[in-house]
UniProtKB/Swiss-Prot annotation:
Keywords: Actin-binding, ATP-binding, Calmodulin-binding, Coiled coil, Golgi apparatus, Membrane, Motor protein, Myosin, Nucleotide-binding, Phosphoprotein, Repeat
Protein name: Unconventional myosin-Va
Organismal lineage: Eukaryota, Metazoa, Chordata, Craniata, Vertebrata
Domain Dilute: 1508-1784
Tissue-level expression: Neuronal and non-neuronal cells of the brain.
UniProt feature coiled coil, ranges: 916-1239, 1315-1419
Main subcellular location: Golgi
Length: 1829
């Protein structure tokens, strides 16, 4: 693309600047090829002429569009170059306070030098399980990606953290390890993750120090491998260390410190255990005072010492070993204070009894003289002899320092080995994630051996990094099948060869170290001779012969040769080491030096796999022939090279992830960005190299759909095809002519660097042109509108002026016209009056004359008409008379003629009738004649009828005309009379008119007078009325004001009291909720510890019961004992479950619940305290009313109960006495009155009497119960029964009892029983049975009517609901209802069948009993009675009907069937089948009915065992299927129902208010199960928490996709295209959830809970928790995703929330508190949509966002990103204003909401109206071994 197309007017470029590195400027005119100068304008408004380089003609780099500024990924920038990268990092760091940014596969982390709240556990949970491209850049995102790729690809991972000292490498590595420890639990050993984290404070204390650049700088490199098992849980870790900076032990530069551990020891010197170390202030010791900065601001070394010791203890370092470590460290400090005195130039000595050396020897346990001798001497060995040589003071000091460094290095390695042993696991490692905390590229004014090794390591790492980046780039191209060429990138291999190849720098250094007289100078000369002018990367400084320069990938570095050989050899005298090894009092010291040679050997690595790199070879005193070890000759450089090769092999075998830490400034100022320092580090850490590699290929990638959506504005309508891919191709070919600038892949379009910016420029130009056109149109419209407004104003003025003139002229014309009209009307009146008189006279004459003529004419016409009528009638009469006469004559003639003809014919017929043939012929003719005659008769009849009708019509017409003529005559006569009267009337009226005119004139005169007086009176009256109204209004106003004041005061007082009461109530509720939450958290913690205890116990059993030969046994991991309960929410439990299920279970002894109950005492006290608080609150609210209600309600109920109990007790006692007396008297009477043979036992009469007596006794018991029930009802329902009836009933009962007693006293009981009583009893029993059957039938009919009514209501409701549903939902609802109806009918039929079966079985059983009794009776009679006696005394058997006993709502089972009951009812029960086919809560009812029977039997052991087994069974089911929502919901519902049953039937008054009398009879009588209710309540809380976890696990994957990512409102894009975001995840989305998915899941949850019969209040709490999870997860992701913070996304979120609110309304759950949990999300969405410019906007935001914390508000404003370039970003000054306004707000500094928070749950008492005695046990449950009682 030509430069002239890009470098146009308004284009922005970057130009170099000495201060800011790069400055932004804008072109003032287009660039043309050949121009030497660019006309620019800087951002501050200064114009500048920028001269181009005449040689290269290189133009300044272009600036990216504003829409790309602040991107999460640097490679998403269209122009990829240094200034763009620097500017993007600066904007994110300074403006948005974002310290993390992606650069391809690299995470760039800038040290903020400030504590940020972005590393808490809530942030870890937010990033856990998320795709890397979905969240904002973070170290946790990199760690999650590594963890996910390890689990998915089953490949080891590495996280390489590098950067300068002080850039934050150690902190980043520490947070990465913390993330792994948090998201994955330990597999076998306890607290493995805690041990991994505990290694950090130990390694920081012994390996970190304060430098000029960093207060906590790591002075060694480390690679930590975190091991995972097959389930990807942490099982251990392993650490490798690299190149410890030992020189810091003996020397520190200005403003630096030694290692932290020394200062921690000095700060803790006052501790009693440290007295023996004889430490003091750090300034006392030579090794800690050289830097002059012993204290770090904000760091307490004493506290850090405590943390270090705690970490050592956690890692298994015993107190004795810890004290040994501290003794060695203290000895090093004292050794540094040892001073030497010179004897001469070649010898020195230590003063006798030198205190520092004495302390050192005491601490080390070595001989003072021996150590003092070898510090001042050394042993030399030749081929023939060995001799001791004194050394100078300088050499002695160097030897002392070398010894101190060697001791510290060995101690460091020992601690590392011990840490590795503590982190080592016996479980086989499946995979690992390595975290490499390595030093970055370093260059100082003086660079020595340490910087050389560091830069060498960075060259190797950079080479590996370049290859990995290149590989990923090419894989993407190959995947999309686009042609690509080899990308040229910087190759580090030449530099690496210069360092490590044969005859390289390290090789020559090692060779020089082997030379007896080798020196730094000779080594430098060898380097010059070998590489100078032969290797382009090697140079020699101009002014030095003791230095060399290497061109590294980042920069040129000049190394000083001085000290290279000494540091490479790192020699320490062996005699000093032998003295330390000889220590007998100190066990740790010899351990540091034992097997030193073995430790150095690469073939004898430590068990942890660590490669020790800082071991120092010990120089032997004498080289023995044949035993010279090559391992002792290995130098530090050689060891480092080998370890680096091992490290690279490890990294190459893993998938690397890169973190580059940047130090923003050298002064540690928070959020201060130094461009110069940042550019240096960006060049050194490879970020710019990544940019260069990306820029060489196709850095910008767009999907076809995104490209089409973004650049649709550049297309014409004819270019848009149905095939989006082809459309994009056609458009690109027109927009970008150079086809090399883009490539078409399978799913994406790849662009070269700068092409997206070019397209954005074209798009912006197009939109700018459109905007200009819109502006032109709008401005024209505004000017037109202004002109029209002015024109309308002018016209209005003209109209008013002309109107005034016209009105004046109109007034003149009106007056003139009025005068003319008055004249006209006056003249017209006179003329009209004269004319009217003449006209009236003429009309009157004409009327009279015309009337006279008309009357004459009328009379003549009337006479003529009457004459014609008379003539007509006369003529008609004459014609009729003549006709009748003629007709009569004709008929007579015809009759005569016919008579004659008939006679003749008769004669013929008589003759013919005598022959048969004639008769036949006649017969045939007669038939035809008869038919013809009949036809003629019919015709004549018809004709007669028609003539008759005509005659009638003529008569009617005649009569009508006659009446009409009569009326006409009458009317004419009347008209004549009226005309005469009118003439007379005219004359009289004329006279009256004249008279009235006079009266009218008088009346008009009077009227004027009256009107004048009335107007005056009216005016006065109106004035008076207005004055009265004003006074009345004032009085009303005053009255209203006073009333308003009184009302306001009353209202204010009321509101104050209500507000105070509400505040107190809220405070009490908060305290109650806090206490409840604290208790439930403790319960949750107890469950977790219990789970942990069970797991450890199972593991211990598993370890103990190792299979032996010939005997195979596997312990169960599922225990059936006690109250074990676990929540399987992690991947580890889910994967462990199949393994546990396969193992056989082993029965254990049941838990004694008394132990668990003792643990609940504290819980009971807390509940009582909460109850007292609640009671106090209730008393404050409704004290008077509630007290009065209680006084009215309690006495009658309590009195009725007491009366019933006392009556029952008295009746029982009296009946017992009566029955005893009766039996005695009866036996006595029988003995006295009957013969011995009759009354002997076994006799028939005796048996009959005894049977009758038994029957009567039973009947009396029945009567007694009826009387007691009646009496209790009379006492408790006095208002329903009249006193008189009460008295009669009681009297009747008393009389009945008195009669019975009299009969007993008289001795007539036998005859009464045999006679009358028997008859009465039979009649009463028959009557009772009939009455009962009638009542049952009536009750059944009522039940059927009620059920039919309910069914009708349900059908009507269903019909109403169906009419509101769409057709598909209507069909589905109808089917569901039909299924429910059929199921209920099926259940009813099953119940009826069961009842009938039971009745049949009962009848059969009674038949068998009766048959058996009859058989026994017959046998007894045959044995005891002779035949004669049988004949003489026949005994008639008496049929005694028994009353069938009602069910008592209990279930009986045997003790040995308890486990079977738990197994069938709990363990193997399928919730779905029970919930669909049976009544809700059936298992709970069954269990309670079993408890009732055990209580009825007074068997405490049975009650305890059943309840314990039930609780354990429920826990076992939830442990086995705890991740199934239906199972958890089912048992939560049943547990609550079981708890409610225990309360409802406990017998406590508070729970019996809603019971029926029958239900009160079912209350428990022998046991108080209040403690078990507490246990069940705790169990319900645990199940509820498990239910919440299951809900969370199901909803979690849906929330972000459905609430944030899915575009619910079509046409409104809430996020940028991925082409602008660039960063994508390594894992493709498996499925996209929408808001409908969430709502469908909510519907599923709600329907399942309703189906299980869960309490409505509990459902509301579950829904509230679900909505809290949705709101918290959505808000947390919003706060961590910059791409989601836009205006359109806020609108999408608000719409989604409204849909959730609509769901709440549909389910009638708006009062559940769920909507309030969404308030933070709603306010966040509103914050994205409101204006964010002025102070008024800031005030509105502060008042609106009261549910968001200050941190959240500021975070949203910082993250706000416009979706397109026409939106404005939030200014930094506006954010500062918000912070100032919210400064006084007291809220949590926490950024994210706690998505794991669970609201405290309560279980309000919900009694059941279901009668226990009506519950049937379905056969499908397999509970045939229990029976109803």
């Amino acid at each position: 693309m030509a430069a002239s197309e890009l470098y146009t007017k308004y284009a922005r470029v970057w130009i170099p600047d000495p201060e800011e590195v790069w400055k932004s400027a804008e072109l003032l005119k287009d660039y043309k090829p050949g121009d030497k100068v660019l006309q620019l304008r800087l951002e501050e408004g200064k114009d500048l002429e920028y001269c181009l380089d005449p040689k290269t003609k290189e133009l300044p780099p272009l600036r990216n569009p504003d829409i790309l500024v602040g991107e999460n990924d640097l490679t998403a920038l269209s122009y990829l170059h240094e200034p763009a990268v620097l500017h993007n990092l600066k904007v994110r760091f300074i403006d948005s306070k974002l310290i993390y940014t992606y650069c391809g596969i690299v995470l760039v982390a800038i040290n903020p030098y400030e504590q940020l709240p972005i590393y808490g556990e809530d942030i870890i949970n937010a990033y856990s399980g998320q795709n890397m491209g979905d969240m904002d850049p973070h170290i946790f995102a990199v760690a999650e990606e590594a963890y996910k790729q390890m689990a998915r690809d089953e490949r080891n991972q590495s996280i390489i953290v590098s950067g300068e000292s002080g850039a934050g490498k150690t902190v980043s590595a520490k947070y990465a390890m913390r993330y792994f420890a948090t998201v994955s639990g330990s597999a076998s050993e306890a607290n493995v993750e805690e041990k991994v984290l505990a290694s950090n404070p130990i390694m920081e204390s012994i390996g970190n120090a304060k430098t000029t650049r960093n207060d906590n700088s790591s002075r060694f490199g480390k690679y930590i491998e975190i091991g995972f098992d097959k389930r990807y849980r942490i099982i251990g870790a392993n650490m490798r260390t690299y190149l410890l900076e030992k020189s810091r032990v003996v020397f520190q530069a200005e403003e630096e410190r030694n290692y932290h551990i020394f200062y921690q020891l000095c700060a803790s010197a006052a501790l009693p255990e440290f007295k023996t170390l004889r430490l003091g202030n750090a300034n006392y010791f030579h090794y800690t005072k050289q830097g002059g900065s012993p204290v770090i601001d904000g760091i307490d070394d004493a506290k850090e010492m405590v943390n270090t010791r705690q970490a050592c203890t956690l890692l298994g370092i015993s107190d004795s070993y810890q004290m040994g470590i501290f003794r060695i460290l203290a000895g090093i400090l004292h050794l540094g204070n040892v001073e030497f005195a010179s004897r001469d130039s070649d010898s020195c000595a230590i003063p006798p009894k030198h205190d520092p050396l004495t302390i050192f020897c005491d601490l080390m346990g070595v001989d003072y003289e021996e150590m003092a001798h070898w510090l001042c001497h050394r042993k030399l060995a030749t081929a023939t002899e060995t001799y001791i040589k004194p050394i100078s003071k300088l050499h002695a000091i160097n030897a002392r320092d070398a010894l101190a460094k060697h001791i510290y290095a060995n101690l460091f390695n020992w601690i590392v080995d011990h840490v590795n042993k503590a982190l080592h696991s016996t479980v086989k490692q499946h995979s690992f994630i390595g975290v490499l905390d390595i030093y970055g590229f370093e260059t100082f004014e003086i660079n020595s051996f340490e910087q050389f090794c560091i830069n060498y390591a960075n060259e190797k790492l950079q080479q590996q990094f370049n290859m990995h980046v290149f590989k990923l780039e090419q894989e993407e191209y190959m995947k999309e099948q686009i042609p690509w060429t080899l990308i040229d990138f910087y190759d580090n291999q030449p530099c690496i060869n210069l360092i490590e190849a044969k005859m390289g720098v390290l090789d020559l250094l090692d060779e020089e170290c082997k030379m007896p007289k080798g020196s730094d100078d000779t080594w430098a000369q060898k380097l010059y001779n070998t590489h100078l002018n032969k290797c382009a990367l090697f140079e020699k400084p101009r002014l030095s012969n003791k230095a060399f320069i290497i061109k590294h990938f980042a920069d040129k570095v000049e190394y000083q040769c001085e000290g290279f050989l000494e540091k490479n050899k790192d020699t320490v005298y062996e005699e000093q080491i032998k003295v330390l090894k000889s220590s007998k009092k100190f066990k740790l010291l010899p351990e540091l030096f034992q097997d030193e040679e073995k430790a150095i050997s690469p073939t004898s690595a430590t068990p942890s796999g660590r490669v020790p790199l800082s071991r120092t070879p010990v120089k032997p005193a004498k080289a023995r022939p044949g035993q010279t070890s090559k391992e002792h000759k290995k130098t530090v450089g050689h060891q480092f090279r080998n370890s680096l090769h091992l490290l690279m092999e490890t990294l190459n075998a893993t998938t690397p992830h890169y973190v580059r830490c940047i130090k923003p400034n050298d002064f540690k100022f928070p959020f201060t960005f130094d461009e110069k320092r940042a550019v240096q580090q960006l060049r050194a850490c490879g970020v710019l190299e990544t940019i260069r590699i990306s820029a060489a290929g196709f850095p910008s990638r767009w999907t076809y759909q995104e490209f089409f959506s973004r650049y649709r504005v550049l297309m014409k309508q004819k270019d848009v095809l149905s095939d989006r891919k082809q459309t994009c191709k056609n458009v690109l070919e027109k927009l970008i002519l150079d086809k090399d600038k883009y490539q078409f892949g399978k799913t994406k379009i790849f662009f070269r660097a700068g092409q997206v910016a070019y397209l954005e420029k074209i798009r912006a130009d197009k939109l700018r042109a459109a905007c200009i056109r819109i502006q032109k149109t709008i401005r024209g419209w505004l000017m037109r509108k202004k002109y029209m407004r002015m024109r309308r104003a002018a016209i209005t003025i003209q109209r008013y002026v002309r109107g005034h003139q016209a009105r004046c002229y109109a007034t003149f014309l009106r007056r003139t016209r009025a005068a003319i009209i008055i004249q006209k009307f006056q003249r017209m009146y006179v003329v009209r009056k004269r004319y009217q008189c003449m006209r009236d006279a003429t009309i009157a004459l004409q009327a009279l004359l015309r009337g006279y003529l008309v009357r004459n004419k009328y009379q003549m016409m009337l006479r003529e008409h009457k004459s014609i009528i008379i003539q007509k009638h006369v003529r008609g009469w004459l014609a009729r008379v003549h006709y009748h006469r003629t007709l009569k004559a004709i008929v007579y003639l015809q009759c005569c003629y016919r008579r004659m003809m008939a006679k003749r014919e008769l004669k013929k017929l008589k003759i013919e009738a005598r022959s048969v043939e004639r008769y036949k012929k006649l017969h045939i003719g007669l038939e035809n004649k008869i038919m013809q005659l009949q036809r003629k008769i019919d015709e004549q009849n018809k004709e007669y009828k028609s003539l008759l009708e005509k005659m009638n019509n003529l008569e009617i017409t005649y009569s009508t005309e006659t009446e009409k003529l009569r009326s006409d005559v009458e009317r004419l006569r009347m008209s004549e009379e009226e005309a005469k009267n009118a003439t007379n009337r005219v004359l009289s009226l004329q006279e009256e008119i004249a008279k009235l005119r006079k009266e009218l004139h008088q009346t008009q005169t009077e009227k004027k007078t009256i009107e004048e007086w009335a107007d005056k009176y009216k005016h006065e009256t109106e004035q008076l009325v207005s004055e009265l109204k004003e006074q009345n209004t004032l009085l009303k106003t005053e009255k209203e004001e006073l009333n308003r004041r009184i009302h306001d005061q009353a209202k204010e007082i009321t509101e104050t009291m209500e507000k105070k009461l509400v505040e107190e109530t809220k405070q009490l509720e908060l305290d109650l909720n806090d206490e409840r939450l604290r208790y439930q958290n403790l319960l949750n913690e107890f469950s977790r510890l219990e789970e942990r205890y069970d797991d450890l116990k199972d593991e211990m059993n598993l370890m103990v019961s190792i299979p032996k030969p010939g005997h195979k046994r596997t312990d169960s991991t599922h225990s059936s004992n006690e109250s074990e309960y676990t929540f399987s929410s992690e991947i580890t439990e889910a994967e462990d479950l199949p393994l546990r299920m396969e193992e056989p279970s082993e029965k254990k002894a049941p838990l004694d619940m008394s132990l668990f109950l003792k643990l609940q005492k504290r819980v009971t006290e807390l509940e009582q305290e909460k109850q007292s608080l609640q009671d106090e609150l209730d008393r404050k609210e409704e004290q008077a009313l509630r007290a009065k209600a209680k006084e009215e309600e309690r006495p009658p109920i309590r009195g009725a109960e007491l009366e019933y109990e006392s009556l029952k007790r008295q009746e029982l006692e009296s009946e017992n006495k009566k029955l005893k007396n009766e039996l005695n008297e009866l036996q006595k009477a029988l003995t006295e009155t009957r013969a011995p043979e009759v009354t002997a036992p076994g006799a028939p009469a005796y048996r009959v009497l005894l049977d009758q007596l038994t029957s009567v006794s039973e009947e009396l018991e029945v009567r007694k119960e009826e009387v007691l029930i009646l009496r209790s009802q009379l006492v408790s329902q006095k208002e329903a029964i009249q006193p008189k009836e009460d008295k009669n009933t009681m009297t009747d009962s008393t009389i009945l009892l008195e009669d019975v007693q009299k009969m007993k006293d008289k001795g007539e009981i036998a005859q009464a029983y045999i006679g009358l009583k028997e008859t009465n009893r039979l009649l009463e029993s028959q009557l009772q049975s009939q009455k009962k059957s009638h009542e049952n039938e009536l009750e059944s009919l009522r039940g059927e009517i009620q059920s039919l009514k309910e069914e009708n209501n349900r059908q009507q409701q269903l019909l109403a609901q169906n009419l509101q549903l769409p057709p598909e939902a209507r069909i589905e609802a109808s089917l569901q209802h039909e299924i429910t109806r059929l199921t209920n009918e099926n259940l009813d039929l099953m119940e009826q069948l069961e009842k009938q079966d039971k009745t049949v079985r009962k009848l059969k059983k009674q038949l068998k009993v009766f048959a058996k009794k009859i058989g026994e009776l017959e046998v007894g009679q045959m044995e005891n009675i002779s035949p004669g006696q049988i004949i003489d005394e026949p005994i008639r058997p008496v049929n005694i009907p028994r009353k069938e006993k009602d069910f008592q709502g209990m279930l009986e089972y045997k003790k040995e069937d308890e486990q079977k009951l738990v197994k069938n009812l709990i363990l193997e029960l399928k919730p779905r089948g029970v919930a669909v086919n049976l009544i809700p809560g059936l298992p709970a009812y069954i269990l309670f009915m079993c408890v009732r029977h055990a209580d009825y039997l007074n068997d405490d052991q049975k009650v305890r065992s059943l309840l314990t087994s039930t609780i354990n069974g429920i826990k076992k089911v939830l442990k086995k299927r705890g991740d199934d929502f239906e199972t958890v919901s089912f048992w939560l519902s049943n547990t609550c129902r079981f708890l409610h049953c225990l309360k409802q039937y406990s017998g406590e008054e508070g729970f019996m208010k809603h019971n029926t009398p029958r239900q009160n009879e079912h209350c428990l009588t022998n046991f108080d199960l209040a403690e078990y209710r507490q246990v069940l309540s705790d169990l319900a809380i645990q199940i509820y928490q498990q239910l919440v976890r299951v809900l969370e696990n199901i909803l979690q994957p849906m929330i972000v996709s459905g609430m944030l990512e899915h575009e619910t409102i079509q046409g409104v894009s809430g996020v940028k295209p991925t082409g602008l975001r660039k960063r994508t995840s390594s894992i493709a989305d498996e499925g996209t959830y929408t808001l409908d998915s969430i709502i469908r899941q909510l519907n599923s949850f709600h329907s399942v809970m309703c189906q299980h019969g869960m309490d409505p209040e509990l459902i509301k709490q579950v829904v509230k928790q679900m909505f809290y999870i949705i709101g918290a997860v959505t808000l947390n992701n919003l706060l961590l995703r910059k791409d989601m913070c836009s205006w359109s996304k806020g609108m999408q979120i608000r719409y989604n929330v409204s849909q959730l609110e609509e769901w709440l309304r549909d389910k009638n759950l708006m009062n559940s508190g769920a909507k309030e949990t969404l308030e933070p999300l709603i306010q966040a969405a509103q914050l994205l949509q409101v204006k964010k410019k002025t102070d008024e906007d800031a005030e509105a935001i502060c008042s609106m966002c009261n549910a968001l914390t200050t941190a959240q508000i500021v975070k949203v404003l910082n993250l706000y990103t416009p979706v397109n370039e026409f939106e404005e970003r939030v200014l930094v000054s506006f954010i500062r204003t918000i912070q100032l306004r919210l400064r006084d707000r007291k809220d949590s500094p926490q950024l994210l909401m706690d998505a794991k928070h669970i609201f405290p749950v309560t279980f309000p008492f919900n009694p059941s109206s279901l009668a226990l005695e009506t519950i049937q046990i379905p056969a499908s449950l397999g509970l045939g071994f229990i029976s109803r009682v």
